[in-house]
Amino acid sequence: MKRLVSLSAEDNAATALSDISPGDECCLEVAGNKYKFNAEEGIPFGHKVALIDFQPGDQVIKYGEIIGRATKTIKKGSHLHIHNVVSDRVVK
């Protein structure tokens, strides 16, 4: 079973605490919310994992903050990165 970290009940993305291979079982409980799923694809250590299914335009929330929006349909257990999420952060 692979470990993930998430800090807020509002989060719909978690961080992988080790490399995750396709099909690996992942479990997480945060603030009473329980998640259990198999990884859809390989996810490197430190990268984001989808805790829910996303539709294009859905907000991606990590550590209680909106960090971006889905650019396509994303299945729970998928790698969240620049290929399927656009950042909401603005660099000044």
Where are these regions (language model features)?
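Conserved SET/PR-domain catalytic core that frames the SAM/AdoMet-binding pocket
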Residues: 16, 20-26, 57, 64, ...
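Hydrophobic residues in beta-strands and at strand termini
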Residues: 7, 16, 39, 50-51, ...
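C-terminal structural segments of small proteins and small subunits
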Residues: 60-90
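Compact, glycine-rich, soluble single-domain proteins
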Residues: 29-63
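Generic, ordered loop/turn and secondary-structure boundary motif
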Residues: 5-8, 18, 44, 50-55, ...
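Short alpha-helix capping/helix-loop boundary micro-motifs
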Residues: 11-15, 45-47, 65-69
